[in-house]
Amino acid sequence: MRLSLPLLLLLLGAWAIPGGLGDRAPLTATAPQLDDEEMYSAHMPAHLRCDACRAVAYQMWQNLAKAETKLHTSNSGGRRELSELVYTDVLDRSCSRNWQDYGVREVDQVKRLTGPGLSEGPEPSISVMVTGGPWPTRLSRTCLHYLGEFGEDQIYEAHQQGRGALEALLCGGPQGACSEKVSATREEL
């Protein structure tokens, strides 16, 4: 009992010391409550399509950039440029990659897709992310959709202008997943 008494006093002391454990509000987090579409639909829910597009743009950009760093030769402008065969393969692999790092979490009562390349501003101190399930397949299909819609050549040209240009190509424009018109339509629903 003697060993447990000092431990108990130490714990009680921490609660009494200003700035100790007792001054902090308890941290709580709950998993996002997913509706039927978010749980069972084969397609990416409309309110998450902008995040999905940005995730796809990030993965394409990152994979192309990694492939370029592996090149030993540069073009006349000093920039490393992939051959059509290589960038086509890299983009195909980007879509078939494992998307397990992505999932959904709720921040300020808004469900958002989260994962590499999607951070916006300060992260919440605690949150719960739902991963796996339909999300990897949905992201892979979204990636394949953009690959088919724009083609490898146009995507690689945008990549060469920078990550922002690639994201603007895939997600911007009047009908893009992140356009204000599409966002306004989502809010009306």
UniProtKB/Swiss-Prot annotation:
Forms an interchain disulfide bond with IgM monomers. PROSITE patterns: ER_TARGET. GO terms for cellular component: cytoplasm; endoplasmic reticulum chaperone complex; endoplasmic reticulum lumen; extracellular region. Residues 1-22 form the signal peptide. A motif (Prevents secretion from ER) lies at residues 186-189. It comes from the Eukaryota. The keyword Cytoplasm applies. Disulfide bonds join C50-C178, C53-C171, C95-C143. The keyword Nucleotidyltransferase does not apply. Keywords: Apoptosis, Cytoplasm, Disulfide bond, Endoplasmic reticulum, Secreted, Signal. One of its GO terms (biological process) is regulation of B cell proliferation. Induction: Down-regulated in primary B-cells early after ligand-stimulated activation. Up-regulated in bacterial lipopolysaccharides (LPS)-stimulated peritoneal macrophages. Changing C95S: No significant activity. InterPro entries: DUF3456, MZB1. Widely expressed with highest levels in adult brain, small intestine and lymphoid tissues such as thymus and spleen. Expression is frequently lower in intestinal-type gastric cancer. In obese patients, more abundant in omental than in subcutaneous fat. Belongs to the MZB1 family. Associates with immunoglobulin M (IgM) heavy and light chains and promotes IgM assembly and secretion. May exert its effect by acting as a molecular chaperone or as an oxidoreductase as it displays a low level of oxidoreductase activity. Isoform 2 may be involved in regulation of apoptosis. Helps to diversify peripheral B-cell functions by regulating Ca(2+) stores, antibody secretion and integrin activation. Acts as a hormone-regulated adipokine/pro-inflammatory cytokine that is implicated in causing chronic inflammation, affecting cellular expansion and blunting insulin response in adipocytes. May have a role in the onset of insulin resistance. Part of the ER chaperone complex, a multi-protein complex in the endoplasmic reticulum containing a large number of molecular chaperones which associates with unassembled incompletely folded immunoglobulin heavy chains. Isoform 2 interacts with CASP2 and CASP9. Interacts with HSP90B1 and PDIA3 in a calcium-dependent manner. This is Marginal zone B- and B1-cell-specific protein. It comes from Homo sapiens. The lineage of its organism: Eukaryota, Metazoa, Chordata, Craniata, Vertebrata. The gene is MZB1.
